[in-house]
Each structure stands twice: as C-alpha cells, then as structure tokens.
Amino acid sequence: MEPGSTVKPFTLLAALESGKFKPESVINTSPGRIKVSYKTFVDPHDYGRLDLAGILTKSSQVGTTKLALQLNPDTTRELFERMGFGESIGSGFPGETSGSLPSYRKWDPVTQSTFSFGYGISASALQLARAYSILASNGFRKEVSMVALDDAPESVAVIDPKLTGLIRTMLETAASDQGTGKRAMIDGYSVGGKTGTLHKVAATGGYDQHRYMSIFAGLSPVDQPRIVTIVVIDEPGIGDYFGGLVAAPVFSEVTGSALRLLQVPPPRLATKGRANPISRSRSSWSGGTC
C-alpha cells in the first residue's frame, strides 16, 4: 500500500536532520496551494504560517512540499531506507514483501514532492509499524518477531534520540484537539500519531476517485511508548473515509484496551472530551490530504 500522510513525520525528520530546519522554523503555506511543475498541491484551507509541528498537525501538503523541495533527494531517501522502507523485515511471515523505495535518481520535483507525503512509495503495515517503532524506541531499529522473545531483540541506532523525541512531541499535537488525529485520543494516556487518507490505485492506472484507504499510525504513551499500532481500513463503507474519522477511533479503542491489558499505568490524564469532526473539504490533489 502507499502509506500516504503517515510518512510525513519522516519527511520532517529528514528536514531536522539536514540542519536546514529547526522545530521553530516557519513555512508560509499561503495561499493554501503550490504549483510544482505540472502539478498543483492544495490544502483544505489557507493555514498561513506554520512551524514544523503545525505542518504535521494540519497535515499540510503545501508545507510538506516546501520542506521536501529544500532537501537533497538522496538524503531524504537514505533516511527512509534507515527507517526500514524498501527492504524485507525478515519476520518469516508468509507473503511478506519488501515494498518499494524508488531511486532518487529518477525523481523530478513532482516526484520529490509526492514522495514526501507518501505517494510513489509502498510499504506493508508491518513496515510502517517498524518505522514508528524507531520513533518510539529513541532512534533504535530492532529486529521484528511474531512471537514473544526471551531475550531483547538486537537493535542498532539509526536516528538521533533527540530528534525522535521532537517528532513524538509533534505527533502528540497532531493527535490532539488541534490536529487531524483528535479521535485517536485515549483517556488517561498520551497519544502521538498521524492520519492518512488516500485514493486507491485504479486498475486502469492513476487513482480511483471513489475508492479510499484510511490509515492511522501511532504510539502510546508518548514519553515512554509501550505500543505502536497501525490501523488500515481498506475501502471504508459509504460515508466517512478520512483517516481521522475512520481509522483514528479504531486506534483509540484497540490501543487503549491493549495498554490496560498490559497494565500500563496512565502517565497522566489525557485531555477530556472530543473536538468536532475534521473538515470534509478536499484538495484538488487526487491523493488526499490527511
């Protein structure tokens, strides 16, 4: 599957790692659209000036695109490679695939832009879970196992832990009342995560304008994560299809139940209540926005 906006945290991670941007760096997303060569990418609203956390919270295509175009394609791809995209996990699970991570030498500005928000790359839910587990484990990539292990799995440091902490904090805002993932909140636990909504590839090529995939990728608790959960809903029923409306509530229920089953003590009380559903406005980019 194409992971869509759930990989935006890794684009922000590449931006921070490059040294060209800081968390407080501001990107002007006005007027809510950007033309790159023959493509125009559009946000649901004109969000104006956004820092990096704001880009993630609003799931801004314009902000993400502007960041991506200022990065070297080879270093961006190399970071995704470190996160485990494009390679076999080695779980031994039947049917496991390595997904695809295209060579940066084939990228034009449009490809560089769409890659930054999860198009032109494919990954399994397990690969996405491993990538988020690197954020959860302070930059360490661990071996994947389908069964409980007596000894801790081997791990290797691939990302600066300070940067993974910054991204987790941004993900917490994205999964709050301010963000597209507000319905992923769990009473008593902090949650960090990112929504994804994308059109499915049509049998005739291009994207099908009437068939969707809704995703939520997240972790909890934010400060010391115990669980990473990936929710993928293939072609949700008639009505809502945004990841924040369809997949995020499933994350909340499943992850909350798992935390209680594991007897993880609530680190703090989560924000009470739920905010109003996110806007149904859609961008002219056929891949979806959040």
Q: What is the meaning of each model-derived region?
A:
Residues 1-4, 10-236, 243, 289-290:
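Beta-lactam-recognizing serine transpeptidase/beta-lactamase-like catalytic domain environment
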Residues 237-239, 260:
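Short beta-strands and strand-coil junctions in structured, solvent-facing domains, enriched
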